[in-house]
């Protein structure tokens, strides 16, 4: 159950379960309805976009190497991992126990409506990360980007420029 596209393509998928969505090029993929499973990887290499309505996965991974965007309107999961290495953006909402959010390029991760118990956020590029952490937050900025967070985590570890990590 893998979707893959390399040319200008628009795919609307409504499946009870998927393992991977892999876009190379400018394809657009819309995941309609509720899709459930254990592991789901969303991968964009190029300018394509992925939009998902409702994902219920134990482990959700989202990767962008290019200018494409990923928009997840609602996720329920244990682990959410996102890495942006290009100029694309990730917008993700929902709940997770643990989230690892990384920006290595100029793209942004907007996850301030993703309620996660523990969050690790790292910016080594010029992009920005915003998110919500309820218990533990580890934030590191080594590039020119910024990290903003919501919530009131009891454990807060910050590394980077003094003004680069702030509460929203």
Q: What role is predicted for each listed range?
A:
Residues 1-45, 51-64, 75-80, 93-97, ...:
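Acidic (Asp/Glu) and glycine-rich low-complexity loops/linkers
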Residues 70-168:
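Short, surface-exposed interaction patches in beta-rich subdomains
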């Amino acid at each position: 159950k893998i979707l893959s596209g390399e040319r200008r393509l628009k795919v609307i998928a409504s499946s009870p379960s998927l393992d991977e969505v892999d876009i190379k090029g400018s394809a657009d993929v819309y995941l309609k309805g509720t899709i459930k499973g254990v592991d789901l990887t969303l991968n964009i290499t190029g300018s394509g976009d992925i939009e998902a309505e409702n994902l219920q996965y134990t482990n959700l991974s989202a990767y962008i190497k290019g200018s494409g965007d990923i928009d997840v309107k609602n996720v329920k999961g244990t682990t959410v991992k996102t890495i942006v290495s290009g100029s694309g953006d990730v917008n993700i909402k929902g709940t997770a126990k643990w989230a690892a959010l990384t920006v290595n390029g100029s793209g942004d991760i907007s996850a301030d409506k993703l309620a996660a118990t523990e969050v690790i956020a790292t910016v080594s590029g010029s992009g920005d990360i915003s998110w919500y952490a309820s218990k533990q937050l580890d934030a590191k900025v080594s590039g020119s980007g910024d990290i903003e967070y919501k919530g009131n985590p009891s454990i807060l570890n910050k590394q980077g420029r003094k003004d680069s990590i702030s509460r929203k």
